Amino acid sequence: TVWTFHLRDDVDWVDVNGEVKTHLTSKDFLVGFEWVMNSYKNEANNTTMPNDNVVGAADYYAHTKELGDAAADLTYEDMLSFGVGVEAPDDYTLVFTCPNSCPYFDTVAAYNSFYPAAEDLINELGIEGFRACDNTTMWYCGPYIVEEYIQGNTKSYIPNPSYYGANDVSRFERFTVTMLSDMNIGYQLYQNRELDEVDLMESTLTTITNDPNNGYNSQLCEKRPKKFSYCFLFNYARNNADGTPDENWNKAIANKAFRQCFYKNLELRPFYARYNKI
């Protein structure tokens, strides 16, 4: 299956101060994809979907792993020469080739494994610097810029002055996302009017819904499941602590009936009932 994406021609990269740094083109998607599939640069983060859904991606990853530190010098051009199924015929066209039929690939390509990355920024920060970049050093191309980031506390956003859709949408002048370690604390912050929206724990939701006079009943909104799927990733060549093959496990997991036992008896309706109690 071949998927062709046509990109906008009016997207710019800006820094944390809103200053335009460079123009975004299809090359940035090639640079970003090579980074993700390079074992040395990316350290294997978020490689599963590209490995499974793009021709040659898994082989390229294995190649970079074999190269070790030498993989640091590879570029997107090396990835293309290796035969990975992604190409950019022009500045605003991106083509992916899947090993099998993948009618949902457009949703796969929206995942962060396929995000663009500016080559100039990587060259400026270096591999270690890009891997560790924060809100002050990264570049942006979306509707907002992260003005302030306090680890484990808050993320504050302001509008990107060069956002391509600025004239077509309404944006907050500034908004802050509070990171919560305990959702009960989140409920308290909501009650104190310090938050505009919060997810509720099941116990809190039960307390509210069991009391028809509770004032928060009128403020409840249904929480719809997000787009996701479950999967099992099995190790078919497990070793014991001494390095010898675990013959019992390897023989069992090779059996289809054994693998099916992991999910055949799953009953997910109680889970969904709790996830969407309203």
Regions found by a protein language model. Name each.
Residues 1, 17, 42-83, 127-135, ...:
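Surface-exposed intrinsically disordered loops and tails
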Residues 1-9, 86-87:
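RNase H-like, two-metal
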Residues 1-2, 115, 126, 274:
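Long alpha-helical, hydrophobic tracts
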Residues 2, 95, 257:
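Alpha-helical scaffolds flanking conserved acidic
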Residues 5-42, 138, 143-275:
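Extracytoplasmic/periplasmic ligand-capture domains
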Residues 70-75, 79-83, 89-93, 97-176:
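Gly/Pro-rich hinge or "lid" segments in bacterial periplasmic/extracellular proteins
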Residues 84-85, 262:
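A generic local secondary-structure boundary/capping motif
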